[in-house]
UniProtKB/Swiss-Prot annotation:
Free-text function comment from the UniProt entry: Catalyzes the hydrolytic deamination of adenine to hypoxanthine. Plays an important role in the purine salvage pathway and in nitrogen catabolism.
Residues that coordinate or bind Zn(2+): 14, 16, 194, 275
Matching Gene3D superfamilies: Metal-dependent hydrolases (3.20.20.140)
Regions annotated as coiled coil: none
Protein name (database record): Adenine deaminase
Keywords: Hydrolase, Metal-binding, Nucleotide metabolism, Zinc
Gene Ontology molecular-function annotations: adenine deaminase activity; zinc ion binding
């Protein structure tokens, strides 16, 4: 079944480039940039990948991202991910990147963007992988900070397909960013947002009604609100669900409790994604395989999930 799932043509719509930084590349970049790391070796770092919640993961995620300094670093990060896409027959990807993670530590916006966009261009030309880049605002920072990031992005408007919203969800509702999303839409950006991962269903309502999103990232807690579920079904709002991430961060205690197939069978346009694959133990195929192993996903369900991902693309 793994080989069949791997060969299935699919798109990935929820993947943070910084979260694809494998320990081996992290150590290589640290050496290249002469950065001292707090971990003795790759295995020690892998051993640190045990999280009780989203915040514990984010603390390590931001620490790891510190090795990304040059345009070449961002190219190598993105290219390594695209090679994984090719190996797993991901024919289209719409990754996130978090400019504030880098600009806040003095890395120029254009350095970050230059490496990523060149790799995506090479991915299209050399690997045949379609792509669209999503600029994500960090929700634990202020809306004013997000506005500054949008200012930095506007000279490179054509490099992006959408803006998004990620990082610590609790206490940072989508409504906090309504003005910057309004402005982004007026500049021609599409919009997506993380909601309903650790945050309540109310955050999903806000993302739909206030941020006017094209897709909900995560959204698994929608199932707690029947009226919300009906709206998502009626309007066919896609959910970019990340099963291994959800279990690794204790959104669900065990994969056998995950609700993705329940949502699929109720008519929700759910998709399968890896979120931060280097930290959560798998890329897209591994996420599909976990659903097969623990939830008994059928080939028909896998086909529908893969087709949903292709249908929910922002870039055609």
């Amino acid at each position: 079944m793994y080989e069949w799932l791997n060969a299935l043509p699919k798109a990935e719509l929820h993947m943070h480039l910084e979260g694809s930084l494998e320990p081996e590349l992290l150590f290589a970049l640290a050496e290249r940039n002469k950065i001292a790391l707090p971990w003795a070796d790759v295995e020690t770092l892998r051993g640190a990948y045990a999280f009780n919640n989203l915040q514990e993961f984010l603390d390590l995620y931001y620490q790891g991202a510190d090795v990304l300094r040059t345009e070449q670093d961002f190219y190598d990060l993105t290219w390594a991910y695209l090679q994984r896409c090719k190996a797993q027959n991901v024919i289209h990807t719409e990754p996130f990147f978090d400019p504030q993670t880098h600009t806040d530590r003095g890395i120029p916006f254009e350095v970050v963007l230059g490496g990523i966009t060149q790799a995506l261009k090479d991915g299209r030309e050399q690997l045949g992988i379609g792509s669209g880049l999503i600029l994500s605002f960090l929700r634990h920072l202020s809306e004013d900070e997000a506005q500054k990031t949008l200012d930095q992005a506007l000279p490179f408007r054509d490099a992006f397909v959408a803006v998004g919203l990620d990082s610590s969800e609790k206490g940072h509702p989508p409504s906090k960013f309504q003005r910057v999303f309004d402005r982004a839409r007026s500049e021609g950006f599409l919009t997506v947002a993380h909601a309903g991962e650790e945050g309540p269903p109310e955050y999903i309502w806000e993302a739909i009604d206030l941020l006017k999103i094209q897709r909900i990232d995560h959204g698994v807690r929608a199932i707690e609100d029947e009226r919300l579920m009906q709206r998502i079904i009626d309007e066919q709002i896609p959910l970019t669900v990340c099963p291994l991430s959800n279990t690794k961060l204790c959104v669900f205690e065990h994969m056998s409790q995950h609700n993705i197939l329940d949502m699929l069978e109720r008519g929700v346009k759910v998709t399968v994604n890896s979120d931060d694959p280097a930290y959560f133990g798998g890329y897209v195929t591994e996420n599909f395989h976990a659903l097969y192993e623990h939830l008994g996903m059928t080939q028909d369900q896998a086909r529908r999930l893969a087709q949903n991902s292709l249908d929910a693309r922002l870039v055609r």
